Amino acid sequence: MQRPFKSLSRSLRQPFNRLYAQRRLREYHSQKRTLDEVVDWAMNFGGGGYMAVKTLQIPGEITRLAQAVQAIKPKIIVEIGTARGGTLLIWSYLASKRVIACDLNDMHRQRPLFSQFPPPESHCQVTLLSGNSHEADFKARLARELNGEKADFMFIDGDHTESGVEADYNDYKEFVRPGGLIAFHDIVEKQPLPTNQVFHFWKRLKVGADVQEFVADPGQCGFGIGLLRVPEA
């Protein structure tokens, strides 16, 4: 009986969670924000249930990445691994035209919230794609959404196994323009879970490449961001 009761409890709380999220979003949009403020909101937006906005990031690391992305004045951003939408809030602030957010989980409940992330003065549109990034059909859906355009920045934060992150990189790097940026999360060697294996792929990928690493503490467990600049054509 615990599972049905838990599901019922969540359903009963959902209207209140939605109202809270809408109030927080109005507060967020009540004034123009600096990038530092947007990162702070991404870390502390809060909420409950499906309407909770969270990000598992170290503030200093994600801020440095966001600054690097801001410097290239991105029009289009693609994110693989949206989860609770915290980083999506940041990308929606930075992209001038479009953010395509991809996640394994169904995001239809979050759509009314996530689609309103861009600032009121922005022309950015948010598209949510739910599905398995390792499936050919999903790649075809993303290709149709881009319709021949290239992303300026791609954030890969989905499958954390070595083979999974390598597959995401190899399958989707073609959608990033020459000179664009691709970032990976959880690149440090010491990780809390054995399935967090991004370090092993990143160690191979960065050899001879134009990369930056944003790591708050070399001895930390988990986190760390690797940034790769795509070679110019």
Q: Each predicted region: which residue ranges?
A:
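Membrane-proximal basic amphipathic "stem/tether" segments
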Residues: M1-G47
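S-adenosylmethionine/decaboxylated-SAM
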Residues: M51-L56, G60-A233
